């Protein structure tokens, strides 16, 4: 309380004119920087990207705070002490840039005619009348009023509001005009596909395809509405309001075209609703109309798309698929089917207030929602067709395969063991931890203090044939040790993957490990649950083949003798005896075809080099993905996600990246010290001298941003004396940079070519040993350099530092300056590439798709070893076409001209072996370098004369 009173008293204290000007100028510098970043995000980045939207919201709230601070500083100065310079703050032109007012309007308004303070004192109608005189349209007036309303609230509160109140609530439609979404005359192809495959789901009468008619001046926000279960089929009660935890945020001004653009998915305001059931009676009384029945947790899994009872922002668009159970009298038999009436909530016909809708549902999120729901599979709960049931009734057995049975839950205790991680997240509280506990059964990781709130262990009791006989099995598949198939964590099943931190898990929530997670196809119900065996499939249904069969499971092969037709692609829960593993087929290396250089080919623009590349097999792709994903944090199987065609984000990746994120405003960029394919390198300061590498990647490309984050994840775990020290990264587009320690000395490329420096055998061996140490460490961490050369190695007084490892994946996805029929080759790059990479070069093959491996890094080290003794690159005087042909066929330069010894040339030939399996590892290379004969001192050294005199 004392601190709050002190801050309030300081805010009320008057300021002198000089101090107020200093504070306003300081805040104005921050405003200029933030506005430039905001305009860059709005114009150069994709508006549909979630990361871009979040950054835009953050910058807008910061700017509101900055303008409020300028108003407060100006208010503390007495009126008689103010001068013209102070009256110029805050600047109206900068506020109009935030609102995205056209330049024509800005040029018409002069600072003497209108100020921001004048607009704050006006009403909305007066603001519109004033701005329309200068040529502003109604849409700009609506945005200006929304921004001024937010600034008034923040300024009146003195900045004590929450961060959510700083966000400007932008309107999405022009005031004064009615926005009636276009209603299609018939359902979309997506809906027709689902209706044709579901026998009892029919479209309603055309009057339900009615558009919403908002009142003039009210912004219309579209959202996928909820489903309700009603006792009367003709009533459309308004949906309940959203909880306070889900705050609706309208889009930014630059993102309004996304809302207006008609999506390729079905229109949001289209309603497809199965007809309702007859009114239900309970105790001879009808339920009052318009009263929604209470929800039931047991029936929530009947609807495709719901897997567990969790609440997260990433599943907010699935609120339209909720089904509530009516209060029916208790049945004597549990097998009696339940009658449900399902109201489709995709654009309900009633008028919903704007504050209850969420306009941030972009076209991409809606498209993923519709595409993710595939057609109803034959294993959907059967629909009864008896005469006593209405044609508009959907009957579902009580024990559907999608319903978890609570009576089979148990309270098995965890088998915890103490563990240590470099960086890990607690499953219960969502906070980071170094020391903690890990369950041996379900692999749950949490703090010691969180064990009391941890959910029960993931063990289930499964009925098998005779209900009296129970078989206990673990929830993880038997091939858990397979590096390609990693077990799913508890957070993957029940916690949203898009949130960096999650709240504590509800104790009453029963974990359902066998239910499909949020990334699986929600409309498929073919995965068998412990409560019921898999339903039989009709002969016409052709199930997909298993992804990764593992026949080495004797226990599960004995317990589960299910046909292979029920094996689906959710999770490998059961192993079936009739699944035969697919043998691996060796791939054939492509052939290099070198066309003769003629004038015709050059004039026609045809490529001088043509390389036939065969696609790699799926086994190699999965093996490469397994190597990349071997990190401290556990990820979902990448091959399984690609088979599902459903995007997914790892929650812990964002948490790890936050630890190394450095705001771009904190960096002091100095002079340019280097430039390469990855961008420019500047000498800068961030708590000392650092090297700032600005990554020059294309904008509006998710693949490049993901590749950059993957390399940052690889950088963060490197700590070695021969590897450059990673200090952090700027990961807020459009500013992407990697901050490392400043390397002293010169590059090995310049040292080798300096004739004044003597490189004898002892010095070259010492340099090579330092490089081998650093590369061996990177390979032990699972990191490939992919661009090892003398220009990426720094040498200073016998110390070697390796830089730029892993950045080749970022440069590989660059398309700037790339031509369709040209292969970009930098000087000195080809002699560092292994033959298997040379043979894959093609104008059509992207650089990040080249088959880099640990063996290719060893080949590049051989080129550096050659350069240390020859003081030049191999094949330097030859053209690129000749180098590609010679190195692709395994030819080597003439070593007799250099005068290498036998031991030195043997190391070079081992590194340059044509077959990559014959190349040694860096551990073996260290042994070979240590066995090199050391050069003794000359006999004319004074030490020898001293020894001879003693004799």
Curated annotation (Swiss-Prot):
**Where does the record place the modification Phosphothreonine?**
273, 277, 498
Q: Where are the zinc fingers (Phorbol-ester/DAG-type)?
A: 413-457
Gene Ontology biological process terms, A to Z? calcium-mediated signaling; positive regulation of cold-induced thermogenesis; positive regulation of MAPK cascade
Task: Provide ranges: composition bias, Low complexity.
Answer: 260-274, 518-531
Pfam families the record matches: PK_Tyr_Ser-Thr (PF07714), SAM_KSR1 (PF13543), SAM_KSR1_N (PF20406)
UniProt domain Protein kinase: residue ranges:
667-932
The protein depicted here goes by the name Kinase suppressor of Ras 2
Source organism of this protein record: Mus musculus
Q: Which gene encodes it?
A: Ksr2
